[in-house]
Amino acid sequence: MIVLDTNVISELWKAEPDRAVLAWIDAQMIETLYLSAITVAELRFGLAAMPAGKRRTIFQNRLEGEVLPALAGRVLPFDLDASRSYADLMAQAKTSGKVIGKADGYIAATAVAHGFMVATRDTSPFEAAGLDIINPWEPA
């Protein structure tokens, strides 16, 4: 099972998404793909911070009308198990001299709590958290 990081969803919304990312997404079985509630929060914040207009409306419709319905039942909450994983992985990263941002830490902890990997372009914080990662921008 794979948790999609925010940058994967954002890439799909570009006027010309990276072909490798499109090919990777197309090769996945939809039921193996998940989002973290933190990713949804990041996407919603990004949209709320955009100037009002057609572009923002299009992206809001994509998130609320396409992405979330397609992943219904597969948006993972940040719960008590994730909070335990967060504390452990952030402490381990700090001890190792590695830095993980809070949002990436929450996403990583959610994935760890469920035994999932993360698909992302920004691999370093998730590697620092000890997760198995997939970079859809790179050939397999």
Curated annotation (Swiss-Prot):
<keyword id="KW-0479">Metal-binding</keyword>
<dbReference type="GO" id="GO:0000287">
    <property type="term" value="F:magnesium ion binding"/>
</dbReference>
<dbReference type="InterPro" id="IPR029060">
    <property type="entry name" value="PIN-like_dom_sf"/>
</dbReference>
<keyword id="KW-0378">Hydrolase</keyword>
<feature type="domain" description="PINc">
    <location>
        <begin position="2"/>
        <end position="135"/>
    </location>
</feature>
<keyword id="KW-0614">Plasmid</keyword>
<dbReference type="InterPro" id="IPR022907">
    <property type="entry name" value="VapC_family"/>
</dbReference>
<dbReference type="InterPro" id="IPR002716">
    <property type="entry name" value="PIN_dom"/>
</dbReference>
<comment type="function">
    <text>Toxic component of a type II toxin-antitoxin (TA) system. An RNase. Involved in plasmid stability.</text>
</comment>
<comment type="similarity">
    <text>Belongs to the PINc/VapC protein family.</text>
</comment>
<dbReference type="InterPro" id="IPR050556">
    <property type="entry name" value="Type_II_TA_system_RNase"/>
</dbReference>
<protein>
    <recommendedName>
        <fullName>VapC ribonuclease Y4jK</fullName>
        <ecNumber>3.1.-.-</ecNumber>
    </recommendedName>
</protein>
<keyword id="KW-1277">Toxin-antitoxin system</keyword>
<feature type="binding site">
    <location>
        <position position="104"/>
    </location>
    <ligand>
        <name>Mg(2+)</name>
    </ligand>
</feature>
<dbReference type="GO" id="GO:0004540">
    <property type="term" value="F:RNA nuclease activity"/>
</dbReference>
<feature type="binding site">
    <location>
        <position position="5"/>
    </location>
    <ligand>
        <name>Mg(2+)</name>
    </ligand>
</feature>
<keyword id="KW-0460">Magnesium</keyword>
<dbReference type="Pfam" id="PF01850">
    <property type="entry name" value="PIN"/>
</dbReference>
<keyword id="KW-0540">Nuclease</keyword>
